[in-house]
């Protein structure tokens, strides 16, 4: 599964881990995150994330 990095603060969203503190189950793909999901560290919207290449 992919990892996505916040271009503002560097937080990494790992699809394997999800974001359980904010109701996102492990295994949730970035594209499947709700449109109102934001970076749990700095509050940046999904549009401020970019996919990390392997």
From Swiss-Prot:
Pfam families: Rubredoxin (PF00301). Fe cation binds at residues 6, 9, 39, 42. It comes from the Archaea. Its cofactor is Fe(3+). One of its GO terms (biological process) is alkane catabolic process. Residues 2-52 form the Rubredoxin-like domain. Keywords: Electron transport, Iron, Metal-binding, Transport. Gene3D superfamilies: 2.20.28.10. Signal peptide: none annotated. Transmembrane segments: none annotated. Binds 1 Fe(3+) ion per subunit. InterPro entries: Rubredoxin, Rubredoxin-like_dom, Rubredoxin_dom, Rubredoxin_ET, Rubredoxin_Fe_BS. GO terms for molecular function: electron transfer activity; iron ion binding. Extremely thermostable, being unaffected after incubation for 24 hours at 95 degrees Celsius. Rubredoxin is a small nonheme, iron protein lacking acid-labile sulfide. Its single Fe, chelated to 4 Cys, functions as an electron acceptor and may also stabilize the conformation of the molecule. Belongs to the rubredoxin family. This is Rubredoxin. The gene is rub.
């Amino acid at each position: 599964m992919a990892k996505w990095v916040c271009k503002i603060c560097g937080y990494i969203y790992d699809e394997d881990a999800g974001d359980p503190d904010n109701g996102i189950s492990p295994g949730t793909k970035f594209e499947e995150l709700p449109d109102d999901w934001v970076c749990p560290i700095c509050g940046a919207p999904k549009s401020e994330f970019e996919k990390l290449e392997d």
